[in-house]
């Protein structure tokens, strides 16, 4: 009776395939870890505070025209005439609660498919609540809503559309990335998500200043 045997070349092929699989796994894990560190770093910088300017559009919707890191969170609303005012904490919390209810019942523009096939930012119809939650300030003030948003693919696209232009969005990303702590000072990075909503949650809500300067709400 002949004993079964394998050629040395067979084992070499199997060994080579195993090595390729291991290299692929390690490479994917490394890329995922780098992405997690980047998003966690961005999330941490956002939690410190954000200065956000929302501008009213002709269709009565609102867009983020400027935002950058700040020691305190401020949300300024600018109307069509150029008048500005700082939203009070009470107003912001009310807007966020109203938007959260829309998210829960599926009517929020943030989680609906983008039907604007023309590619223009005009007419997207984001209200104040949607614009706030799509901005950096939303990641701070509405962090508890994050679990309802950051796994939604429509939100990932719509959050960028809350900005007035691609340039405004890119400026925001760059400014928060520059202020983010380095990976060496962060320790182990937690799992991150795209957009401003990350897995980290601020320990306390940043103070928000309030005031009125001629904007009729």
UniProtKB/Swiss-Prot annotation:
InterPro entries documented for this protein: UPF0323
Bilayer disposition of the protein: Lipid-anchor
Keyword set includes Cytoplasm: no
UniProt signal peptide: 1-27
Comp. bias regions, Polar residues: 160-171, 186-197
Region span, Disordered: 160-217
Main location: membrane
Residue ranges with Low complexity bias: 172-185, 199-210
Protein family per UniProt: Belongs to the UPF0323 family.
Protein name: UPF0323 lipoprotein HPP12_0232
Organism of derivation: Helicobacter pylori (strain P12)
